[in-house]
Amino acid sequence: MVRKKLWVMQNKAIFYCGTNGSGKSTLRSFNQDAVQIVIDSDHIAMQINPQNPRLADIDAGRKAIGLFHFAIKQHIGFPMESTLSGNSIIQRMKTAKENGFYVHLNYIGINRVEINLARIKARVKSGGHFIAEDIVKYRY
């Protein structure tokens, strides 16, 4: 019971991790009421360059990191997505915990890379962002 009260009282840092096309954004969409701001570098990239968001990945990543630091400093709950392809997300989890956030990790695993590729293809057809097949396979 005490643990549940902490979950309600503490700011939440919810991390959605998994390979590209695994459903991180889909899962996150079900938990929108649990956070105050959303840190989504893919969405930021789409805002910067709607025609080719991949060209804006570096700028979007910087803006996402800026939002992360803002959320930590202001004690604002947030979700963040990652493919876990680097160590920086682990450091962000530690930083959030050290700053009093309740850190929750959701890992979405898919048992075949073909499913990820099909999901990405469907996402692109509906206006979502593209990720190159070789990158998806490498991260898988």
UniProtKB/Swiss-Prot annotation:
Alphabetized, the UniProt keywords read: ATP-binding, Nucleotide-binding
For molecular function, the Gene Ontology terms on record are: ATP binding; kinase activity
**Cystine pairs:** none
A Pfam family of this chain:
Zeta_toxin
| The keyword ATP-binding belongs to this UniProt entry's keyword annotation | yes
Q: Which Gene3D superfamilies match?
A: P-loop containing nucleotide triphosphate hydrolases
Q: List ligand-binding residues for ATP.
A: G18, T19, N20, G21, S22, G23, K24, S25
Q: What is this protein called?
A: Uncharacterized protein HI_1395
Taxon lineage: Bacteria, Pseudomonadati, Pseudomonadota, Gammaproteobacteria, Pasteurellales
